[in-house]
């Protein structure tokens, strides 16, 4: 009786030992699996945050461009581009200006005023040419305004070079108002469609990248859940 009981106890002990070994292996596998899932979840969370941050930054860039560049582009009336013939170019007078010489320091100077008149081919009307839209806002009497500086002779030399370039090229493209409300033409548009495209290109790429990152993470999570459900069904 004693011998039979001892054998049974030994067999039971071996069975329990094997079961403990299998349980430890299974627990170890589950622990590794949980660590892997936790690491993947942390990486997915970081990827989603990156995608959302990219989308928020692109929206902010869209907003800034909308209130600055896009607004000026929509308000511009000089939309018709055509060849214009030079009628007259001359330096008429000088105007006072001020420039910064340091913190809380301003000095007065002068700049020469260059006037350029062109011929409107369709009607033969004489129009004043401006370098850009900002030139007309600064001084409506001048076609080209050099940067205000301490050296007046340097400004005069720069304006003389611009004047000679106009005389050398008698025909050049300009932008005019097709409705005829503005009696002036623009040589260079600061807010053209090409500038608008290049300004909106990078925010659009950032937005597309953020959306793609979030979509890829969500797709990966969906496929992972789908595979897990299939494995449970097969079991």
Curated annotation (Swiss-Prot):
<dbReference type="GO" id="GO:0008076">
    <property type="term" value="C:voltage-gated potassium channel complex"/>
</dbReference>
<dbReference type="GO" id="GO:0001508">
    <property type="term" value="P:action potential"/>
</dbReference>
<dbReference type="Pfam" id="PF09303">
    <property type="entry name" value="KcnmB2_inactiv"/>
</dbReference>
<comment type="subunit">
    <text>Interacts with KCNMA1 tetramer. There are probably 4 molecules of KCMNB2 per KCNMA1 tetramer.</text>
</comment>
<keyword id="KW-0407">Ion channel</keyword>
<keyword id="KW-0813">Transport</keyword>
<dbReference type="GO" id="GO:0006813">
    <property type="term" value="P:potassium ion transport"/>
</dbReference>
<protein>
    <recommendedName>
        <fullName>Calcium-activated potassium channel subunit beta-2</fullName>
    </recommendedName>
</protein>
<dbReference type="GO" id="GO:0005886">
    <property type="term" value="C:plasma membrane"/>
</dbReference>
<keyword id="KW-0325">Glycoprotein</keyword>
<feature type="topological domain" description="Cytoplasmic">
    <location>
        <begin position="1"/>
        <end position="46"/>
    </location>
</feature>
<comment type="function">
    <text>Regulatory subunit of the calcium activated potassium KCNMA1 (maxiK) channel. Modulates the calcium sensitivity and gating kinetics of KCNMA1, thereby contributing to KCNMA1 channel diversity. Acts as a negative regulator that confers rapid and complete inactivation of KCNMA1 channel complex.</text>
</comment>
<dbReference type="InterPro" id="IPR015382">
    <property type="entry name" value="KCNMB2_ball_chain_dom"/>
</dbReference>
<dbReference type="InterPro" id="IPR037096">
    <property type="entry name" value="KCNMB2_ball/chain_dom_sf"/>
</dbReference>
<comment type="similarity">
    <text>Belongs to the KCNMB (TC 8.A.14.1) family. KCNMB2 subfamily.</text>
</comment>
<keyword id="KW-0812">Transmembrane</keyword>
<keyword id="KW-1133">Transmembrane helix</keyword>
<feature type="transmembrane region" description="Helical; Name=2">
    <location>
        <begin position="195"/>
        <end position="215"/>
    </location>
</feature>
<keyword id="KW-0406">Ion transport</keyword>
<dbReference type="GO" id="GO:0005513">
    <property type="term" value="P:detection of calcium ion"/>
</dbReference>
<feature type="transmembrane region" description="Helical; Name=1">
    <location>
        <begin position="47"/>
        <end position="67"/>
    </location>
</feature>
<feature type="glycosylation site" description="N-linked (GlcNAc...) asparagine">
    <location>
        <position position="88"/>
    </location>
</feature>
<dbReference type="Pfam" id="PF03185">
    <property type="entry name" value="CaKB"/>
</dbReference>
<feature type="glycosylation site" description="N-linked (GlcNAc...) asparagine">
    <location>
        <position position="119"/>
    </location>
</feature>
<dbReference type="GO" id="GO:0015459">
    <property type="term" value="F:potassium channel regulator activity"/>
</dbReference>
<feature type="glycosylation site" description="N-linked (GlcNAc...) asparagine">
    <location>
        <position position="96"/>
    </location>
</feature>
<feature type="topological domain" description="Extracellular">
    <location>
        <begin position="68"/>
        <end position="194"/>
    </location>
</feature>
<dbReference type="GO" id="GO:0015269">
    <property type="term" value="F:calcium-activated potassium channel activity"/>
</dbReference>
<dbReference type="GO" id="GO:0005267">
    <property type="term" value="F:potassium channel activity"/>
</dbReference>
<dbReference type="GO" id="GO:0019228">
    <property type="term" value="P:neuronal action potential"/>
</dbReference>
<keyword id="KW-0472">Membrane</keyword>
<dbReference type="InterPro" id="IPR003930">
    <property type="entry name" value="K_chnl_Ca-activ_BK_bsu"/>
</dbReference>
<feature type="topological domain" description="Cytoplasmic">
    <location>
        <begin position="216"/>
        <end position="235"/>
    </location>
</feature>
<feature type="region of interest" description="Ball and chain">
    <location>
        <begin position="1"/>
        <end position="45"/>
    </location>
</feature>
